[in-house]
Regions:
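Conserved functional hotspots at enzyme active or ligand-binding sites that engage polyanionic ligands
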Residues: 1-107
Length: 107
């Protein structure tokens, strides 16, 4: 499967430790295509359907459900954890993800 930045993928996140988000769930690919094409790992942010209004979370609508991209739990996973493709973020969602990533990790 070809993996692209801002793609939504179904990922098995188990096993986890402590407060890490667990289970098999949708995640957003954060790593750029150049990395995704050449490495056996990808950087992802999990999506949850239960969230508080944290400044590091982006609300999205996917598969007729409201969810939040959890940018405060970004992690690197092996591609073998990816189960299937679920779609892609919209352009406004991508713009908001970029803004929060920049504000959180760059500024």
């Amino acid at each position: 499967m070809e993996i692209k930045q801002y793609q939504i993928i179904l990922v098995n996140l188990d096993p986890t430790i402590g407060s890490e988000i667990k289970k098999t769930r949708p995640c957003v690919v954060i790593s750029p295509d150049e990395m995704n094409d050449h490495l056996r790992t990808v950087v992802i942010a999990p999506i949850t359907t239960s969230s508080k209004n944290y400044p590091t979370r982006v609300e999205i609508k996917h598969d007729n459900k409201i969810g939040w991209i959890v940018l405060d739990q970004i992690r690197t996973i092996d591609k073998h954890r990816i189960l299937k493709d679920l779609g892609k973020l919209s352009k406004p969602e991508i713009k908001e993800v970029k803004a929060i990533l920049k504000e959180t990790f760059v500024d």
